[in-house]
């Protein structure tokens, strides 16, 4: 029986590579039993130096609601990160006084 993480990808993008741990994380879109899935999955390098999917990851049916919710979440996270960077850059001294003293 083929597992969902073994189905051939329709789209694949490397989104993280940890060379020291021989790990990669890929964003993929694949079809399994006639359903398209969006997956974020960790891959490991086997003894033959081939990249293999691990069981660590998540797969969601690729539909409008899941895509929109994922996009909304990423936009919110990126906005918070951007705001955090701006606050740290412009108010670092004040924040250090508040939180480190």
How would you name each of these model-derived features?
Residues 1-20:
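Negatively charged, low-complexity tracts enriched in Asp/Glu with abundant Ser/Thr
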Residues 16-30:
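Enzymes that process phosphate groups on RNA ends and nucleotide/triphosphate substrates
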Residues 19, 47, 62:
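Solvent-exposed, flexible loop/coil residues
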Residues 21, 33-35, 66-68:
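A generic structural micro-environment signature
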Residues 26-56:
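A short, structured beta-strand/loop element
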Residues 7-8, 52, 60:
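Intrinsic-disorder/low-complexity coil detector
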